[in-house]
Amino acid sequence: MGFFDKLFSGVTGGSREPQKPSGVELELRRRLTVFASYEATQDTPLRYFLRWEGQVQGVGFRFTNTNLAQARSLTGWVRNMEDGSVEMEIQGAPANILSHLEALHASYERIGTRFRLVDAQARAPLANEDGFSPQIGRAHV
């Protein structure tokens, strides 16, 4: 059964345990939680470069990220890479980025799609970025 068949039929990933976040993702979540908990930094936009591996191509991963980011007023982009990974830059309030990560996992958990965050790097926020968009095509590694 293909991805979209599973999605529309409501079939779950079977008896597999829910996927645990990678060490990279746990550290990112810890940092975001700290920033979100202090009044001085809770609304300060942060920007991160993220790279995901696993079942991230051919499953609507870019478009799911786009929809989740737009719903949380985040900016940035997401693109497929030739090596099968997905890269993105995401910017916004720490609590909104944290919510995005949680919603991303929840979106794929019920159909058993496995992926993990393998790289997370802080970047300088962009002042004039407008929106979040998928980049079409594959970028070279």
Residue ranges of model-derived segments:
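Intrinsically disordered, low-complexity, mixed-charge
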Residues: 2-138
